[in-house]
């Protein structure tokens, strides 16, 4: 544990760790985006939240956040429209509004409306951010989700993708008029995994135009579930599959977040792991 704390502390004060993780030089926008990320993984005896963002290096717009506070787990995934610094600023504002509401212990409906208003007031009607907000009660497995024009998360149960956690058609943050979004409510079973992703994952294309697609993502998730690998390793393998499918530099950021609930008694200790990226081949 002490060694881990020393590494985490050193990472805050030296740029060498960050440069090596990135693999190659980033644009200013992508660097800003990278520095916005939380620890890669949070883990307790009840739950694991793991995220991975593979940046397009010249593009920036994806961002994710997560926290564990007692019996409450919050997860968010955002994708700002466009490319470059403008896209990063959109996501930064959405993330800031989200974190403020979460720390004020607001419900998801209020949080959704606040993010929507913040984007609209600052950027007008010409900009938007898609996103998904998730809240899990680890004592009961009760889960709430709100969606803002984003790909619907997948639910993995008993090593099978059993469906999407979807609502009726929703609109992105910034164009909803503060009206919020319908809540999805469900109850997880011990061992369930919720998988959030951005369009950069499923829209990665081979030179012949073949998209990676949701079906391929679901198939790989089921294969990885059968392997019983740790969520962090599952993410690395999924992102590697996206990169291999693309066969070259990504055209858009590709981000995945896994939320796995194991059930069982609550634990006070939360173990963070610092951000990282898949090393280029």
Regions found by a protein language model. Give the residues of each.
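Structural preference for long, well-ordered alpha-helical segments in enzyme cores
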Residues: 115, 194, 198, 217, ...
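Catalytic strand-loop-helix junctions within cyclic-nucleotide turnover domains
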Residues: 135-140, 204, 226-227
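Interdomain signal-transducing alpha-helices
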Residues: 1-10, 199, 217-221
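Divalent-cation-assisted or electrostatically stabilized phosphate/pyrophosphate-binding catalytic cores
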Residues: 181, 189-190, 212-225
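… and, occasionally, acidic/histidine-rich disordered N-termini of signaling adaptors
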Residues: 17-195, 248-281
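Regulatory loop-to-helix N-cap segments in sensory/regulatory domains
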Residues: 1-3, 7, 203-204, 208, ...
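Amphipathic coiled-coil signal-coupling helices
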Residues: 6, 10-20
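Short, well-structured alpha-helical segments that form the helix of a local strand-helix-strand
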Residues: 108-119, 230-242
């Amino acid at each position: 544990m002490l060694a881990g704390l020393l590494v985490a502390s050193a990472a805050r004060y030296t740029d060498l760790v960050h440069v090596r993780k990135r693999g190659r030089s980033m644009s200013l926008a992508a660097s800003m985006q990278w520095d916005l990320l939380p620890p890669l993984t949070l883990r307790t005896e009840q739950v694991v939240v793991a995220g991975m963002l593979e940046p397009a290096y010249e593009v920036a717009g994806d961002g994710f956040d997560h926290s564990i506070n007692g019996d409450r787990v919050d997860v968010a995934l955002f994708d700002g429209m466009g490319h470059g610094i403008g896209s990063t600023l959109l996501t930064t504002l959405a993330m800031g509004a989200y974190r403020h509401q979460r720390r004020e212990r607001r419900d998801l409906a209020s949080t959704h409306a606040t993010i929507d208003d913040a984007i609209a007031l600052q950027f007008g009607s010409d900009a938007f951010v898609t996103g998904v907000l998730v809240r899990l009660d680890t004592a009961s497995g009760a889960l709430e989700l709100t969606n803002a024009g984003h790909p619907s998360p997948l639910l993995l149960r008993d090593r099978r993708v059993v469906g999407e956690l979807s609502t009726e058609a929703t609109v992105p943050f910034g164009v909803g008029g503060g009206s919020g979004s319908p809540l999805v409510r469900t109850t997880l079973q011990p061992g369930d995994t919720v998988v959030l992703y951005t369009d950069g994952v499923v829209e990665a294309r081979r030179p012949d135009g073949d998209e990676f697609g949701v079906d391929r993502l679901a198939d790989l998730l089921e294969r990885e579930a059968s392997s019983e690998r740790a969520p962090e390793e599952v993410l690395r393998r999924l992102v590697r599959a996206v990169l291999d499918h693309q066969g070259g530099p990504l055209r858009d950021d590709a981000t995945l977040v896994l939320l796995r609930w194991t059930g069982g008694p609550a634990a006070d200790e939360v173990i963070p792991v610092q951000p990282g990226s898949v090393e280029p081949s």
